[in-house]
Amino acid sequence: MGKKSLVKLTRKTNPRIVSLILTLKDRANVDSAPIWKDIAKRLEAPSRNYAAVNISKINRHTAENDVLLVPGKVLGAGLLDHPVTVAAVTFSESAVEKITEAGGKCLSVEEIMEANPKGSGIRIFR
């Protein structure tokens, strides 16, 4: 790991994010999956630049049974009328309710990384 990466990690105060970034980078190298390296790079940025995606945007831009990854937080504004699998760093309580009511699943980034090591078929939402 380069010196620049270590500086970015030491600025993070949330130990979960630090370990997630390291795990993502390791998985990107082991599985030759550039999606995990991209997500790690996005999470190294300041948290004020993390994605904040509403349910309404997910509803507009996805089809039934899509798998998406949000490098940030999923918020509960809007309605969801089809099942989707959403992985994110964090979810609001109302977002979890709406996704599960529509028949979808809420996963952490670690869980989707274990389920799909190559990252194929995953859409990144910003």
Swiss-Prot record:
Coiled coil regions, renumbered to chain: none
SUPFAM superfamilies: Ribosomal proteins L15p and L18e
InterPro entries noted in UniProt: Ribosomal_eL18, Ribosomal_eL18/eL18-A/B/_CS, Ribosomal_eL18_arc, Ribosomal_uL15/eL18, Ribosomal_uL15/eL18_sf, Ribosomal_uL15_CS
Keywords: Ribonucleoprotein, Ribosomal protein
Gene3D superfamilies from the UniProt entry: 3.100.10.10
Pfam families assigned: Ribosomal_L27A
Keyword Ribosomal protein: yes
GO MF entries: RNA binding; structural constituent of ribosome
GO biological process, one term: translation
GO CC term (a single one): cytosolic large ribosomal subunit
Annotated family: Belongs to the eukaryotic ribosomal protein eL18 family.
Name of this chain's protein: Large ribosomal subunit protein eL18
Name of the encoding gene: rpl18e
